[in-house]
Amino acid sequence: MEKIVIIPTYNEKENIENILSAVFGMNQDFHVLVIDDGSPDGTADIVKNLVSKFPGQLFIEERKGKLGLGTAYIHGFKWALAKGYQFIFEIDADFSHNP
């Protein structure tokens, strides 16, 4: 059963490693897709460096500019459905709610 968590980001360098560790630490075989809206703080670079730590489980889509949270989720849902994921979850990177 393929499960994926979509995490939109914009300037989340302070949170991204912690939220990814929390999601992967749940031991639920989740895959994670980060949708980054061109964060100038290097959020996408942090995620790209972590991809090798979670091969085949962590993915990133980089968008040009800040296109908004809603469109980031829609982008992620379309990506996940095209890849055949059966369960799609969403979470904010800022820990506004626990994973």
Name each model-derived stretch.
Residues 2-4, 31:
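Cell-envelope/extracellular polymer assembly enzymes that use nucleotide-activated donors
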Residues 85-96:
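Short beta-strand-to-loop acidic/aromatic patch adjacent to the donor-nucleotide binding site
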Residues 14-18, 41-50:
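Acidic helix N-cap motif at the loop->helix transition within catalytic regions
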